[in-house]
Each structure stands twice: as structure tokens, then as C-alpha cells.
């Protein structure tokens, strides 16, 4: 007879043996895969800036991460990320919110004309839905439109051909273009355009709204794929805190709200759908035992060690060659940090960054006291 319902639970159910006493930066059994992801599966990656680390690690370990919008041959490799190439499976940049994801999918899979929301900048046209993919903007509106048409055909190809979508949930806060209803990856006025409250509104997506967006994404993509085999979804939550908040809350409170909502949405989806799995990169990096090592000095940028710690748990479940490689190898071959350097100035001004993250621009434009 048990004295307590906790008496015979496995060690992973208790904080002390499974977290506080964790050794060698490994937390055993924190992730048990729901389904196989093989190296022959076609993977589409998308999400907030942390998702770029995941895509880079998957490629390096031999997974088939599709890229249907590659850089032109004449563009030097060191310029690829300046133009949005090589970040994801197509040139859509960071998709920070669930609403951004479903709106892009609907646009790419529809037969209608592309949505054109643009800003003027020094005589050029900036695609407000992808403000960072052309550093100097487009010379004409027709050029912007043609690039967007081409881009959407690439996204459509990704959505129809993928076997697994790896999507990192990043933010709940976003800015909406009122006339079209489209949400933007970056607030107006940060890199181009200007903020006019009659044209744009701040939106903070709640639990129900995020959940509905993800369910709608499934319906839209499933309908377009027809008789193709059903795709699977691997969700993660970005451990990168918000750079700034447009809510009335303190940034720390706003960040906790945002990540809590997204984590809850991911859990609800994973618990209710056999085609959806959740990988706990958020928990692996934000856990208090390794917190000091997992972040750089700005308490926001994920360190090389932090990325490697998270991805080693993923690889141990999905890479059959991982044991022969060894766990220490994952640390040594981790993706570069979001921003190189060890102080705030270096982190803000690094030109060698391996990760493109538009949200960081919000801090650069603030009015200093």
C-alpha cells in the first residue's frame, strides 16, 4: 500500500534529482519524441530568430532542411543573411507570431494577388511584410510586387512538399496594418515608414487567438495539400526574451506573459494532436541551474553553450548517429551565438552575427534618458 501518490514516481517527476542534481549539462529524459523525424524527411523551418539555430544544427547533422529560395550564385556567401537568404526554407525572414504564420500560408496558397504593404525609404520601396530582406529596398513598386510573387510561389512549394514543419513560437505582441489586417514582423518607423495610429494598431495575441491561428494554419495547409501525406509539426518556444514591449506592463512581466501564453498553446496543441510534438528548448535554456551559462551578458542572447545544450537533447532522440558522434561534439559544433561579443556594445553592433533578428532594432531606436 502506497502512503502517497508520489511515492513510486520516476525520478524525472522530482526537481532535486532531475534538475538540481543534473550533471554534465544534461537533463535525462526531458524530451521523448512523439514521432520519428528521419534524415530523409523534408523539413521546413520557420519562426522567431532562435529558429535559425535549430535549422543550422539540423543541416549540419545531415537532416534535409529544404531551401526553395536560395541565394543567387553571384551573391557572396557572407552577404546571404543581409538579403534574407539561408535563414529559413524560403526568404520570409522571422515569423514571430502565429498570426504572421497563418497569414503567410493563406496568401501563399491562394490564387489571388499578393498583399502589398510598403513603406517609402530614401526613394525606395520596402516590403513591410519582409522589411529586412532587401537592405536598401526596391527601386519600384512593380519590382517589389514581382519579388513578392516569386517569394510566395517558393513558400507555396515549401508548404506542399514538407514532411515536417519545425516552428518556433516567439512573440505574442505585434503590429497590425488596419486596412489589410496583416500583422508585421517589425513596427512601422523602425527601419522605414512612420507610425500612424490611424493606420496601425498594437495587438497582443491571447491564448485563444494563438490557438485558433495554429488550428487555422493546419486547416489551410491540409486543404491545399489534398491527398498528400499529412505533415507533422514540431513546436518550440523561443527562450530569447522580448527586446521591448508596447504593452503597459514592465518588460519582465510582459515577457513572462508572452512566453507563458505560447508555452501553454504549444502544450495544448501537442496534447490534443498526434501530428504535433513539442520540443522543450525553452525549458532547457531557461532552467535556473544552467542559466548563467546559457545566456550572454545582456541576459537575452543565447550562448553557444546554451544552444548546444538544447540541441543535444533533440539530437539524442532524432539523430541515429548522435551516440557515435558523442555529446561533447554537439557543444563544440554548436551554431554561433545570436550576437557575438561579451558586452552590450558588441552585442548591439556586431556585423558578424550569424543570426538575423529584426526585433533587436527596437532597442536601438529608443529615446535614451
What feature does the model see in each segment?
Residues 1-369:
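Extracellular glycan-modifying ectodomains
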Amino acid at each position: 500500500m502506497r502512503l502517497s501518490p508520489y511515492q513510486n514516481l520516476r525520478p524525472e517527476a522530482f526537481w532535486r534529482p532531475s534538475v538540481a542534481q543534473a550533471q554534465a549539462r544534461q537533463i535525462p529524459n526531458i524530451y521523448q519524441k512523439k514521432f520519428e523525424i528521419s534524415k530523409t524527411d523534408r523539413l521546413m523551418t520557420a519562426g522567431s530568430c532562435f529558429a535559425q539555430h535549430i535549422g543550422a544544427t539540423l543541416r549540419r547533422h545531415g537532416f534535409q532542411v529544404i531551401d526553395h529560395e536560395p541565394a543567387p550564385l553571384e551573391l557572396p556567401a557572407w552577404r546571404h543573411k543581409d538579403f534574407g537568404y539561408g535563414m529559413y526554407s524560403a526568404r520570409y525572414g522571422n515569423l514571430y507570431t502565429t498570426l504572421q504564420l497563418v497569414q503567410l500560408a493563406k496568401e501563399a496558397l491562394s490564387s489571388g494577388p499578393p498583399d502589398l504593404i510598403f513603406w517609402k525609404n530614401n526613394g525606395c520601396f520596402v516590403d513591410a511584410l519582409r522589411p529586412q530582406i532587401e537592405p536598401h529596398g526596391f527601386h519600384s513598386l512593380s519590382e517589389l510586387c514581382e519579388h513578392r510573387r516569386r517569394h510566395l510561389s517558393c513558400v507555396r512549394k515549401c508548404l506542399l512538399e514538407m514532411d515536417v514543419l519545425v516552428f518556433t513560437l516567439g512573440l505574442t505582441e505585434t503590429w497590425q496594418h488596419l486596412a489589410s489586417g496583416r500583422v508585421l514582423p517589425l513596427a512601422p518607423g523602425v527601419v522605414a515608414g512612420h507610425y500612424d495610429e490611424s493606420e496601425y494598431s498594437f495587438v497582443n495575441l491571447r491564448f485563444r487567438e494563438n490557438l485558433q491561428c495554429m488550428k487555422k494554419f493546419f486547416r489551410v495547409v491540409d486543404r491545399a495539400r489534398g491527398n498528400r501525406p499529412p505533415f507533422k509539426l514540431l513546436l518550440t518556444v523561443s527562450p530569447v526574451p522580448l527586446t521591448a514591449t508596447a504593452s503597459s506592463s514592465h518588460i519582465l512581466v510582459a515577457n513572462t506573459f508572452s512566453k507563458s501564453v505560447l508555452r501553454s498553446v504549444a502544450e495544448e496543441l501537442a496534447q490534443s494532436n498526434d501530428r504535433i510534438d513539442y520540443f522543450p528548448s525553452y525549458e532547457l535554456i531557461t532552467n535556473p541551474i544552467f542559466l548563467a551559462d546559457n545566456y550572454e551578458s545582456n541576459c537575452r542572447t543565447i550562448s553557444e553553450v546554451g544552444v548546444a545544450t538544447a540541441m543535444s537533447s533533440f539530437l539524442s532522440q532524432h539523430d541515429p548517429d548522435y551516440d557515435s558522434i558523442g555529446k561533447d561534439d554537439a557543444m563544440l559544433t554548436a551554431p554561433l551565438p545570436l550576437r557575438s561579443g561579451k558586452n552590450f556594445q558588441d552585442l548591439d553592433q556586431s556585423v558578424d552575427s550569424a543570426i538575423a533578428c529584426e526585433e533587436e532594432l527596437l532597442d536601438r531606436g529608443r529615446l535614451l534618458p
